[in-house]
Regions:
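Extended amphipathic alpha-helical interaction segments
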Residues: 106-269, 273
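Residue-identity detector for threonine
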Residues: 20, 34, 40, 65, ...
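Short, solvent-exposed mixed-charge patches
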Residues: 1-2, 316-318
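Alpha-helical repeat scaffolds in large eukaryotic proteins
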Residues: 73-76, 80, 98, 102, ...
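Generic alpha-helical secondary structure signal
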Residues: 79, 180-183, 235, 287, ...
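Charged, amphipathic alpha-helical oligomerization/scaffolding segments
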Residues: 6-9, 13-16, 20, 67-74, ...
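N-terminal Sec/ER secretory leader and immediately downstream segment
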Residues: 2-116, 256-257, 261-277, 281-298
């Protein structure tokens, strides 16, 4: 099915975005540390302390964020593989995923959802790799996809885009502010401008250069903020697209019936409860074949999704 194949084709772009943004979590911390103005012994100590903190906290945080993002990357790739019946030997390391998610500051329910996504798709592909299960994969995992995508995107936005990168801008301001103030002090000490015209011109040129360098460095960080925001938007758009596919494949219903949950549980290590579910007979009959109408709707939302996320991925890769 072309819709899900296109969904899967974008997994490579999603993987690049995940690697780029996750790596910059540590890099941003390190850059902030090196922006510490080194005019005193104490400032050198502060810079060293910052770098130590980056190694202790943000290096593993960066690595675990990439692991967290890989849950969605692998899932998106797996959906594409199901659509094209291309078994590429997908074998996510569930223990590594569980351990990595456990070390991130995200909601416990989201951690559980991430592990459940990886667990479900692994069991599905290993035990019953059939294109017919494409609808099963999308319908069964959507609730966890929504929960996990929301928490992951919120985490990246709050901890990276709005925290680390803002701190980096603050450090750049303070760094250049220190050296610009040193130039200003020297300018103020020039008592006779006519006798010190050359010194005045030299100092003014230094100040202008420092201010231009500051703006250039801040512009670099602003571009990284745009890339981070693009990744956040891509995650949210992917989840939105997945929900649309789920509703197309589930007769425009949000909830799953007991019959559907039983089918989903076939691929879950931990089975879900069947209580309080819709048990209407016509809803319980779950046709796993994709109808012509469903295919037409899926193609439409797929085109909308690709048109929406392609510029976002281009922003990250530029």
């Amino acid at each position: 099915m072309s819709a899900a194949k296109s969904f899967g084709d974008l997994s490579q772009s999603l993987a690049i975005a995940n690697e780029t943004i996750s790596a910059d979590i540590y890099a941003s911390c390190a850059r902030s540390a090196t922006w510490e103005a080194l005019g005193t012994q104490q400032s050198r100590i502060n810079s060293k302390d910052r770098l130590d903190k980056c190694d202790e906290i943000y290096l593993p945080n960066s690595q675990n964020t990439e692991i967290a993002g890989s849950v969605l990357v692998n899932y998106v790739a797996a959906v594409g593989n199901l659509a094209t019946e291309n078994d590429n030997g997908f074998t996510p390391q569930l223990n590594k995923i569980s351990d990595g998610l456990g070390k991130l500051d995200i909601d416990e329910n989201a951690r559980t959802a991430g592990v459940k996504i990886a667990d479900f798709i692994t069991n599905l592909l290993v035990t019953d790799f059939r294109r017919d299960n494409l609808k099963v994969a999308i319908v069964c995992t959507d609730q966890d996809i929504q929960k996990y995508s929301t928490e992951l995107s919120d985490f990246i936005e709050s901890s990276y885009v709005k925290s680390l990168l803002n701190e980096e801008i603050t450090q750049i301001h303070e760094n250049y502010g220190f050296y610009i103030s040193e130039v200003n002090i020297r300018l103020l000490k020039l008592s006779n401008l006519e006798d010190n015209l050359q010194d005045f011109s030299t100092l003014q040129a230094q100040q202008t250069l420092l201010e231009a360098e500051e703006r250039a460095e801040i512009t670099k960080v602003i571009e990284r903020k745009k890339q981070g925001s693009a990744y956040v938007a891509a995650i949210r758009s992917t989840a939105e697209f997945h929900r649309k596919l789920k509703r197309i494949f589930n007769k425009d219903r949000e909830e799953l019936s007991s019959d559907q949950i039983q089918k989903c549980n076939k691929y879950r290590s931990k089975k879900e409860s069947l209580s309080f579910q819709n048990t209407e007979k016509e809803y319980d009959v779950w046709n796993q074949e994709i109808t012509t109408s469903e295919l037409k709707q899926a193609k439409k939302v797929t085109k909308e999704y690709i048109d929406k996320v392609t510029p976002l991925f281009n922003e990250i890769q530029d």
